[in-house]
Amino acid sequence: MPESELKRFYIVREHPVRIISKCKSHSKGTLGSFLIGFCLFYAVVSWVPQILSEFIPATNIDLFATYTDADPAMLSQLPATPLVIILYSVFFSGVFKLSECVYTLTYIRNRQADYRAFTESFSYYLKTLGIYIVQLLLVAFWSMFFIIPGIIVALNFSQAFYILADDPDKSISEVLTESKIMMHGNKMNYVRLLLYYVPYFMIAYIPATLASAAAAKFSLNEPVLLIITLLTDIPIFAARGIMSMGRTVFYELMINKGFADFRYAGQDAFRELETR
């Protein structure tokens, strides 16, 4: 890879604790409004396919049984996933990822939650679909050669939707190539940052775990179980929103080459610890 390309971006060496601390400082007084928007968005995104699957229960197993000669005993061992959830994920995950990036970038840069940011990505639906499908195919292909190559490919493309959010005119190949260049030397640091958010998710999953145990004990009917499941998803969405801020700041560090060069509303929150 040409050295000139590598020099365009910054190797993030800031410790994850430092990044998380600065995110907390930045979000004082506005975290609630940010998480409300984030949770509402992902509530709609996650609940729609779950509700639809109650009315369209056909699964991937039903499809295999109808159109293939696969052994029924073997099919019964496979996990059954409603087709509506599979199709929904393939056709809408890309645009939802871009919506998250636009919303969180807007919040980090302007220090205010702008719910209109969620709708802007739909103008670029076909491009987001193309990026997501290319990512999906490449990760699936490289995962066939053990899991590690697939993880590396996923990390290489992890900044694609942030790049698209900053410049929607870039082509699919330009976005993916730039993401790969940005992540050169940053993959392990990025993974380390994500691992620091594991405790947030462990806490967030407690309500869902308790609800699952209660459902098994009291044999709740399907509608009640669905409502409980939807409600216990909310803490998980909140944890995802908090992690999204850290991921976004990581992207900002790469393009701004460190905290000192942040140039937007709220920049002082990221600089106030620089002298300590």
Per-region residue spans from a language model:
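Selected alpha-helical membrane-embedding segments in polytopic membrane proteins
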Residues: 43, 47-50, 72-108
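Juxtamembrane transition segments at transmembrane-helix termini in multipass membrane proteins
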Residues: 2-10, 14, 18, 22, ...
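Hydrophobic alpha-helical transmembrane segments of multi-pass membrane transport/permease proteins
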Residues: 32-54, 88, 92, 138, ...
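Alpha-helical membrane-spanning segments of integral membrane proteins, especially the hydrophobic core
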Residues: 73-90, 114-143
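Residue-level hotspots within the lipid-embedded alpha helices of multi-pass solute transporters
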Residues: 10, 38, 42, 86-94, ...
